[in-house]
Amino acid sequence: MTSKRRNNGRGKKGRGHVKYIRCTNCARCVPKDKAIKKFVIRNIVEAAAVRDISDASVYEVYALPKLYAKLLYCVSCAIHSKIVRNRSREARKDRTPPIRFRPMRGEGGQNARPGQANKLFNMSPRK
């Protein structure tokens, strides 16, 4: 039978069995090597309240703690929540991670937004 992917959608090479984990979203059992992993680092305090807390703090330079979470998704939940997308047969062979959006100062002192990257850098949109 033909294979859709070189790794059959898994990271298991030479191992007979891999432990199962539960999907963060739907609690489905998924092999650990097949699960789509997403590591999220967020501030515990939302951005709107950071200034209020820093003003009310006794310490002048207090670094607010961050929330670290490793999210593990089954394939269907990852597709549904747009963490991964369907790709063409040729694009599936490309194993490089997607380019991450990093906000930079744009023209006129405005913060760049994901939808306006083309205007700031005169790039054509991806298809």
UniProtKB/Swiss-Prot annotation:
Q: Where are stretches of biased composition, namely Basic and acidic residues?
A: 87-97
Where is it mostly found?
cytoplasm
Q: Where is this region: Disordered?
A: 86-127
Tell me the compartments it is located in. Answer: Cytoplasm, Cytosol; Cytoplasm; Rough endoplasmic reticulum
InterPro entries, alphabetized: Ribosomal_eS26 (IPR000892), Ribosomal_eS26_CS (IPR047864), Ribosomal_eS26_sf (IPR038551)
One GO cellular component assignment for this chain's record is:
cytoplasmic side of rough endoplasmic reticulum membrane
Q: Which GO terms describe its biological process?
A: cytoplasmic translation
* Superkingdom, taxonomy of origin: Eukaryota
Q: Does the keyword Ribonucleoprotein apply?
A: yes
Q: Which keywords has UniProt assigned to this entry?
A: Cytoplasm, Endoplasmic reticulum, Ribonucleoprotein, Ribosomal protein
PROSITE patterns linked to this entry: RIBOSOMAL_S26E (PS00733)
Instruction: Kindly list the GO molecular function terms attached to this UniProt entry.
Output: mRNA binding; structural constituent of ribosome
Which family is it part of? Answer: Belongs to the eukaryotic ribosomal protein eS26 family.
Subunit text: Component of the 40S small ribosomal subunit.
Name the PANTHER family for this protein.
40S RIBOSOMAL PROTEIN S26 (PTHR12538:SF0)
Name of the featured protein: Small ribosomal subunit protein eS26
The scientific name of the source species is Octopus vulgaris (Common octopus)
Its gene?
RPS26
